[in-house]
A protein has these predicted regions:
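Short, exposed beta-strand "edge-strand" segments with a Pro/Gly-rich flavor and a Y/T-containing core
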Residues: 66, 137-139, 167
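Alpha-helix boundary recognition
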Residues: 7-10, 126, 152, 177
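Short, structured coil/loop segments at alpha-helix boundaries
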Residues: 14, 114-118, 170
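Long, charged, low-complexity intrinsically disordered regions
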Residues: 154, 158-179
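Nucleotide-state-sensitive switch-loop elements of NTP-binding domains
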Residues: 1-113
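Phosphate/Mg2+-binding loops and adjacent switch elements
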Residues: 71-162
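Short, ordered loop/turn segments at secondary-structure junctions
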Residues: 21-23, 136, 165
Length: 179
């Protein structure tokens, strides 16, 4: 999804920086984005919402001061708490009004998320400017309905977008990013 957002921004003549937080040593997504000539800043060795918050702050500060960017795309690792990301972003000069928080929900695993990661859903979905239900091409009608139920449990009015990431309409991505 991050790659698709970068492509849409690039097609719209927007300059974007991409920050990816990888827990492992090698970022597979990062390699793909670099092959497509996107500049990617990688933050390794932990979660940017807690142990690497200073690294995030420094990276964003560097991007804002040294590059003429329209947008910074940020992909935290795994189940990072998005509320913990706001403070380092604000300290680096990014305003809360400029942050677009997009939550992506996998409908194939929504039951597991609700059973195991309920506190994460409870803190993440209310902060989201939009929620994307991904993999609609392989999810059952029941899984999609459950996904909407879970989203609405935590936010009654967040916009929900249903997509197949392999065949997503660029117009939908633009609406989400401009939202």
């Amino acid at each position: 999804m991050l790659l698709k957002c970068a492509q849409v921004l690039s097609e719209s003549q927007k300059k974007c920086g991409i920050i990816v937080n990888e827990v492992g040593e090698i970022g597979i997504d990062n390699l793909q984005m670099k092959k497509m000539r996107f500049n990617v800043w990688e933050i390794f060795g932990g979660c940017i919402c807690c142990t690497l918050a200073i690294s995030l702050e420094e990276t964003v500060h560097q991007l804002l001061n040294n590059y003429d960017l329209d947008t910074i795309l940020l992909e935290p690792s795994g189940a990072s708490d998005p509320s913990a990301l706001y403070k380092p972003l604000e300290k680096s000069g990014y305003t809360t009004q400029k942050i677009k928080n997009i939550f992506i929900l996998d409908p194939l695993r929504v039951d597991m998320f609700e059973a195991v990661l309920e506190p994460y859903l409870e803190s993440s979905i209310p902060l989201a400017n939009a929620v994307i239900i991904n993999k609609i091409d392989v999810a059952s009608a029941f899984e999609l309905e459950e996904s909407v139920r879970v989203i609405r449990k935590y936010s009654k009015d967040v916009p929900i977008f249903r997509i197949n990431v392999n065949d997503v309409d660029s117009g939908i991505i633009k609406r989400i990013l401009e939202g």
